[in-house]
Amino acid sequence: MTNIRKTHPLLKIINSSFVDLPAPSSLSSWWNFGSLLGVCLGVQILTGLFLAMHYTSDTATAFNSVTHICRDVNYGWLLRYLHANGASMFFICLYLHVGRGLYYGSYTYSETWNIGILLLFAVMATAFMGYVLPWGQMSFWGATVITNLLSAIPYIGTDLVQWIWGGFSVDKATLTRFFAFHFLLPFIVTALVMVHLPFLHETGSNNPTGIPSDPDMIHSHPYYTIKDILGFLVMLTALASLVLFSPDLLGDPDNYIPANPLITPPHIKPEWYFLFAYAILRSIPNKLGGVLALVMSILILAIVPILHMSKQRSMMFRPLSQCLFWLLVAVLFTLTWIGGQPVEHPYIIIGQTASTLYFLIILFLMPMISLVENYLLKW
């Protein structure tokens, strides 16, 4: 008799996606981040749902409702900090997942890669709108500064900004719509994930060597499910440690001051996971140029498959490309640091140098080094 998981209309979809899915036998821990992102998304949706039951999206009461959640709701403080720090874990896993894709050449699965870029944009939009909801100083001024960037778009810019604001400044209408979109977007992200996975399963997973592994496949369950569970435990331990020992480590103290349109904070900055893009934005003196550079800092991932010049897929056997990759990682850390610093010497020139290097490495140096490595293969 055939097992029910192979015949039941719903169970067979789950079976083919998680149980009997053929996977390369050589997958390292870098392949854990997809499942970790799934757990992060689940944690965020659940904690967010319970927070939404107590939150009020009104400028007069939003800040107080967050205080009420932390002080008066049973385990409200835990929900709030799990949600805030869960976002940080989400982005750590996201950036490591993208970095894995770049290092091992997973971007050659173009459909999966492009849907992944859409997912990245959707998660970034969700996180930005979520940062506005507590209605602290950094929430208000962050929303004002970032939405104002759209005014750099020629002809329609000013009208577009006022349309998003729902008035002539960030106010009650803005907060209400941001809450609505912040609630809606995670479900759109979930839908995109459900498109991301079938495209991946259509081609099968890449592996660290970058060599086709069709003759050497194993079942996902139990081999990789056990490995994923270990990943869950490590990540959830890290998240629990952050939430219980230092919940405000990654937040901004200014967000504990209620939003005041009459007092500008001395240094407006987004959450840490956007600082690299914020540094690229600030490094260009022209407003429209800065906005274009900001968008391109993420959108550049879409042209990475076109720039792949190497005869080998993975960087595992390409030491010169490896050096460039880790230089790129160092540049991103530098940009993250610069994004959190005031706009003054020497931070301005460091930011401009790092921004130039970021685009230079991806657009020119990586393809050139790949061609050099191709030539060296002949020796």
UniProtKB/Swiss-Prot annotation:
GO terms for cellular component: mitochondrial inner membrane; respiratory chain complex III. The keyword Transport applies. Gene3D superfamilies: Cytochrome Bc1 Complex, Chain C. Keywords: Electron transport, Heme, Iron, Membrane, Metal-binding, Mitochondrion, Mitochondrion inner membrane, Respiratory chain, Transmembrane, Transmembrane helix, Transport, Ubiquinone. Heme b b562 binds at H83, H182. Changing T176P: In strain: Isolate TK 17308. A ubiquinone binds at H201. Its main location: mitochondrion. The keyword Heme applies. GO terms for biological process: mitochondrial electron transport, ubiquinol to cytochrome c. Binds 2 heme b groups non-covalently. It is a multi-pass membrane protein. PROSITE patterns: CYTB_CTER, CYTB_NTER. The chain crosses the membrane at residues 33-53, 77-98, 113-133, 178-198, 226-246, 288-308, 320-340, 347-367. Heme b b566 binds at H97, H196. Pfam families: Cytochrom_B_C (PF00032), Cytochrome_B (PF00033). Its cofactor is heme b. One of its GO terms (molecular function) is ubiquinol-cytochrome-c reductase activity. Changing A240S: In strain: Isolate TK 17308. The cytochrome bc1 complex contains 11 subunits: 3 respiratory subunits (MT-CYB, CYC1 and UQCRFS1), 2 core proteins (UQCRC1 and UQCRC2) and 6 low-molecular weight proteins (UQCRH/QCR6, UQCRB/QCR7, UQCRQ/QCR8, UQCR10/QCR9, UQCR11/QCR10 and a cleavage product of UQCRFS1). This cytochrome bc1 complex then forms a dimer. Belongs to the cytochrome b family. Component of the ubiquinol-cytochrome c reductase complex (complex III or cytochrome b-c1 complex) that is part of the mitochondrial respiratory chain. The b-c1 complex mediates electron transfer from ubiquinol to cytochrome c. Contributes to the generation of a proton gradient across the mitochondrial membrane that is then used for ATP synthesis. Heme 1 (or BL or b562) is low-potential and absorbs at about 562 nm, and heme 2 (or BH or b566) is high-potential and absorbs at about 566 nm. This is Cytochrome b. It comes from Artibeus obscurus (Dark fruit-eating bat). The gene is MT-CYB.
